[in-house]
Amino acid sequence: MKQLSHPLGTVYVPGPNDDLSEAYDLYRNSDVTWAADTETTGLNQYKSYFRVRIVQVGTTDKAWILRPEWHMQAINDLTGGDGRPVWWHNWVYDGLGMEESLGLNFDNTFTGAQDTETAFRLIDPRPIMKGGSGHKLEQLGNEYIAYAGKKDARGMILEECKRIHGRECSADNMWVMIPVDNEAYQLYAGQDVFLTARLAEVGMVKLKELQLTRFYEFERPLGWRLAQMQRDGILFDDEWASRVEQEYLDTAEQYERELAEQWGITKGKTAKSYANSAAALIDKFEQFDVVWNKFSDKTNRPSLDKSVIKELTNFGSNEDIKGLANAVFEAKRNHHYAGYIRQMRDELGSDGRIHPNIRPMQAATHRMSISNPPIQQFPRDDARVRGSLIADDGEVIITADYAQVEFRVGAAVSQDKVMTSKIINGEDLHETTATALFGPGFNKGQRQASKPIGFGRLYLGGANGIYKQMAESDTTGYLPTINQVKKAIKAFDTSYRGYYRWATGLKDKTEKTGGILYTATGRRLIVSPSYAAPNYAIQSVARDLFAAGINKAHKMGLGKYIRLVVHDEIVASAPADKAQEIGAQLSEAMSTTFKGVPIEVEWDIKGKRWTK
């Protein structure tokens, strides 16, 4: 059996008939930390070209490189399907990949699966750019194992690949092109095992020291349940999507022509469209006497970001400025929405379904994220993008979403009596800010326009920041002035004094603790800057309540219907004749009471498509 020497241990590369008894003996020894990993042909397990090339298993200093064509029985025996704890780094990726490529049942793999990424996201949620240790295997290895070889191994693989294949090989395709029997590749694979096993031992000690073990035990089954959603995926209507994409492109082209023909905008050498021709647009706006109040950090030229353009579409009575800004805004918006359709098609599995990557603790607040494609960014103001995702045959889409969850959690953690009373009595939480802006006779559109002030102030947002957000997103036509926003903020703070005291007190306390914050559920977060403490505290608790609801829904047998989780919303596909029953059950699973405040759910049957 070939042996390769690595600074952290020995990498064993067995042939088809070599003896693996030592690996089996160590696996059976429950005192030994056992780790595993895979090397694959790509990141999307549901593409037709996806393959698991090797599975590597072992301990802190011994690793075996197993090839599916030779060692399938050993792969099956040594990866935790019997319940023996096996440590992975982002085990969901490897588990789903082995199921799709090798036929290993994902749910069986879960019985023994433990995850170092989950452990270290609990220990320090911050990425490197925010002062944390990061969460990639090589980042954690450099921080906790004091070994910085991972980067060198990647470099060696690329060099080897280029030596063999020349310019044809790149950082993007080297994982497919590098020969499986290349020693640099095998050392890299073995190193993953060494690092994962060593990080597992460090991580479990730290979880215990920080009293976070119960959160790890909570997150483990949650990760499995989210992975089941990823595996099941959601059906994609390509015919609808193609038509919608063309509609967006046609509309964008209409506004592009307007920019060229009506407004005389010329396309710059590097601009992909008239709407991105910054120099020409700035000159044209200045011809209409626009005075700029925001500039690009990189170029120091006037900024044409979304907030600036949106504000100009509501620019007083100057119809030229508003017309030009509207053409720019609509051209960009429609190009952007067409891009979402392309992203869905790029990620489409060979089974005709989208299998998005649902990460349970991606944000610094431990909120979930959904990407590839970025479904949580899909627009709410235009149902056509979401409408590309549909229920299975004979089924309908059901959505279940928390009602004003941030306010409800804010009332619970602050114990503000006025806010709590309004929630319990079903009163309008946005009445205070809407009245301050528009008077007691405000209409529905004006109430909608005032909502960003309440949500912004919940997180101690200032007038300028809240106003910018409103300028970017307002579709009501009732955009207030900055002075009106300041007046509404004062009314909010006066009405909800208890909340304001809690929020400012938490900010001050977090500053004194160096950013360490323990939420109302006991979760440990690291906040920076300290004024973000109320945001972290509320978002994290809301996430824990949502996660508990997901777990409960699965225990009630509803997991087979759930297709997506987006923000605080569950998207399900269920038989039409059972939709009422299943919707009510989802609502029951998600609803709860937290510190005396009801956390309520609104659910709806959408029909065939995930639309309004």
Please place each PLM-identified region on the residue numbering:
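Conserved "right-hand" nucleotidyltransferase catalytic core of DNA-directed polymerases
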Residues: M1-E22, R28, A35-T40, N44, ...
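Active-site-proximal helix-loop-helix substrate-binding element of RNase H-like nuclease domains
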Residues: K2-G15, N44-L207, E431-L437
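Short, glycine/acidic-enriched loop or turn micro-motifs at the edges of active sites
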Residues: T40-G42, V92, T118, Q404, ...
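Metal-dependent catalytic core segments for phosphate chemistry
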Residues: Q45-Q56, W64, T399, E406-G441
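Short, conserved charged micro-motifs
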Residues: Q73, D577-A584
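Conserved catalytic core of nucleic-acid polymerases
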Residues: R231, V290-W292, K310, S317, ...
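Short beta-strand-to-loop capping motifs
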Residues: A572-A576
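A common structural junction motif
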Residues: S587-V597
